[in-house]
Amino acid sequence: MSGVDLVAVYGTPALVAHLANAAVLPVRIDGAAFTLFSLAKWPGVRRFPRIALAMAPARRLTVDPALRGWARRTALADALYTVMARAALDAYDQNRSVFDALLDARSRFGRNTRILEDAERQPLTYGRLVLGSVALGHALTRAAGRGGARSWASCCPTPRRLAITIFALQAFGRVPAMLNYSMGPDALVTACRMGRIRTVLTSRRFIALARLEPMAAALAEHTVLACLEDVRKEVGPLDKLWGLAVSWVPTLMRGRTAPAGSPGAVLYTSGSEGTPKGVVLSHANFLANVAQIAAVVDLFPTDRVVNPLPVFHSFGLTAGLFLPLLVGVPTCLYPSPLHYRAVAALVAERKATVLFATDTFLTGYGRAPSEGELASLRYAVAGAEPVRESTRRLYRDRFGVPLLEGYGATETTPVLAVNTPTHGRAGTVGRFLPGIEARLAPVEGFAEGTQLVVRGPNVMLGYYVAERPGVLHPPPGGWYPTGDIVTVDAAGYVRIVGRVKRFAKIGGEMVSLARVEADAAQHWPDDTHAAVGLPDPRKGERVVLVTSRAGAQHDEFVAFARARGIPEPTVPKAVLWVETIPTLGSGKVDYPTVRRMAENALREAGARQAGLKNVPSSKDVILDGG
């Protein structure tokens, strides 16, 4: 819906309630779409569907009394929309495990409804997904015994099998720890030690194809590697019978799964700014974020989702897997977001209506396809990194597809704010999801913006850290400091200024490295850029811009900055060209590696200027300026 549609739907009842000084009683009717008389044509239609009625406390709509005419009507419609979105969140049952929610979705949308597939083209129905998860989980539990470790790491070859493994562990109270195999052997061993993980589920074929033998060898020294090829042989008739029974009678699992407040999964921070930490998320965290997103984003069982993001990333796990599965949307998972042409073709083949990805990957998908391959999309959702205007323009002009930018963190499961079809504003990450409490804390030295601190049902249970393995470190009072500097306008739209850690202090002035990257994106919109702050003997720090722009010249960028009136401290002192900007498995820029590249390039340049001989030179970097 557009903003006009929002007023058309909510404007009149909101205005009537306001003029009558009446309170609004939010009522949510859930299940009516499954009746024989429904026009929705959703799967799971039956003669006598279960109808749930949920009522929230009555509330009065308040707006600025100075508003008149259309402005007041729009504000009232928006206020009523906010009330109803919160009512939708409150009506969703978050007091259960994720697997219980999957069983409920199976009952609601039908056992034979196809819901999940991947690049292997072997679709799973709800019934087969439940059967496979319960059979595998029963076999794993039987093999480990009741006293087995609660946390099991997962590093599986295909998204579909990984999804089954996640639900298998959750179904029997185990906690899947999602290992990012691109982290490197040492980081993976540290991740396992953090959560006291003793068993890692993986695959010999996956290890061989991805050439991960060093990773497997390192993990094998500290954990037990359980290969799925062997585990499948251990799934016996009793396990399959139990899975079949639950797939037909989901209530057999009632009371057997973990409590809502217990850990549902462990994910790891990207390490884009330092050592990764283990983020412990509860079942209630996942279900709350699913409900928060579903309350504001129109996602229906008639949609089709393509998710190329890895599920060891919180965006890929919550938004790309749990959300569509639990609201009845058929989902296709793809194992690598880097296969641009293949993902674009998959969207066309599946006639997908929703695509989840990051800005970097969306740019690749937008440039790769033939004419019309992305035409089926209703919208694409971008997260994990800022969306460039060039990407937004590419999707709007070439495909007519709106690009909805969101924002969050692994610690918030992950979504905190998102632009939606009804509420969107370019240059922002949208408005906070219902249920989010935000505190804006001033930070010394920052002229614009404040640090965002949040609390809500989707905020993590706590961290695992390398220094104290297995010890949970909860956020004080439930408040999580995001480390992001933001501004929030009068309409509630959030704009990210930068990160506290991603500022350089130059002569006492705080310079946003994100601002430097944004300026570079304006000058060279078709390339990727990363800015880092390095020590400077005179001014404390200096900014170095690392770019994939071939032939990038420092003087050229300085001229551009002067023409645009960009403040002098924000102009990088050196421009470093690299063939490819290093990224993590999530698609985020790998800033520690970028920083090391910049340090090495500056050190080599300084040595050459000093007249030293035999100074090694990096093959793929060219430094200009400095």
Predicted feature descriptions by range:
Residues L287-R304, F312-T353, A368:
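Conserved AMP-binding/adenylation subdomain of ANL enzymes
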